[in-house]
Amino acid sequence: MSQITMRQMIEAGVHFGHQTRFWNPKMAQYIFGARNKIHIVNLEKTLPMFQDAQEAVRRLVANKGTVLFVGTKRQARDIIREEATRAGMPFVDHRWLGGMLTNYKTVKQSIKRLEEKTAALENAAESGFSKKEILEMQRDVEKLERSLGGIKNMKGLPDAIFVIDTGYQKGTLVEAEKLGIPVIAVVDTNNSPDGVKYVIPGNDDSAKAIRLYCRGIADAVLEGKNQALQETVAAAQEAAAE
């Protein structure tokens, strides 16, 4: 698992919070001080908390768990998609659809529609559809793919959710709380840590910082998968030896 260092966090600007006038008092315990009217996050707290989050992810995935990566704001979208894909985990990078978890039954129907439309599009030319009809089908598929593409292979509700910017993803937190799904989240000085099981206090606007968090969590996922694989192989060898 990648060992993130204090130096890497400083270089990525993890310690830069929001303007002091926008602060959330619930984040006071994680704030070191202020510089030029900007809150400075205490990285001596952030680093071990991030490591705790990584360890929780590793354990969960080693037990065949699923982590849903969520980051729909502009700076986070591409990074969330890339790192979740690298880790082989589901993600939401475009827009959080209300009921994505609490109304998962309906979402599953939409995913089925996406699969059917994708299959129909692949055979559209041979099936005699006009160019105009094919173009309309493409637009439909692209629209559904944007909203649901990252979760189309998710087998059921996730076991945990990793979130960038709790203020931006309020809907995600509300649904996770309703369903009792633990949340691992980057929480900046202007947001509340309420409803987050594993808080990572830090900058949620810098692309460099977001890349650092996502890479660290994705690495933890891959380590958990590797552990699960090793345990499966060891069990198979043991069974064969008996």
Curated annotation (Swiss-Prot):
The keyword Zinc-finger does not apply. The keyword Electron transport does not apply. InterPro entries: Ribosomal_uS2, Ribosomal_uS2_bac/mit/plastid, Ribosomal_uS2_CS, Ribosomal_uS2_flav_dom_sf. GO terms for cellular component: cytosolic small ribosomal subunit. Transmembrane segments: none annotated. It comes from the Bacteria. Keywords: Ribonucleoprotein, Ribosomal protein. One of its GO terms (biological process) is translation. PROSITE patterns: RIBOSOMAL_S2_1. GO terms for molecular function: structural constituent of ribosome. HAMAP family: Ribosomal_uS2_B. Belongs to the universal ribosomal protein uS2 family. This is Small ribosomal subunit protein uS2.
